[in-house]
Amino acid sequence: MDISIISDKNNPLLQRREVKFTVSFDAATPSIKDVKMKLVAVLNADKKVLVVDTLDQIFGKLEAEGYAKIYNDEKAMETIETKSVLEKNKIEEEAEAEVAEE
């Protein structure tokens, strides 16, 4: 799985960095958890404040386009983000913790 960054801009009003990216892969579309962990490595970000907002498959290609946000702190993230997006990303973190325990 390869990630290429399309745009990376700072949004001081909302206390976050906004990243648009493209993911290339060989098999099935990667999960949000896999993409999030790869973005943490590529962008050198804290996984607690990185939120993968969208991950959309490009029809007919082994690529997906995504949009992620990296907040300055957890308080800003919880204030701004919707519950559904936080739950989607939180579930992935809990699943990762279960795998680490085994």
From Swiss-Prot:
Entries under InterPro entries matching the protein: Nucleotide-bd_a/b_plait_sf, Ribosomal_eS24, Ribosomal_eS24_CS, Ribosomal_uL23/eL15/eS24_sf
Protein keywords: Ribonucleoprotein, Ribosomal protein
GO cellular component: ribonucleoprotein complex; ribosome
Entries under PROSITE patterns matching the protein: RIBOSOMAL_S24E (PS00529)
Xref: Pfam families: Ribosomal_S24e (PF01282)
Keyword Ribosomal protein attached: yes
GO MF terms, alphabetically ordered: structural constituent of ribosome
Family under the similarity heading: Belongs to the eukaryotic ribosomal protein eS24 family.
Name of the protein this chain belongs to: Small ribosomal subunit protein eS24
Organism of provenance: Methanococcus maripaludis (strain C5 / ATCC BAA-1333)
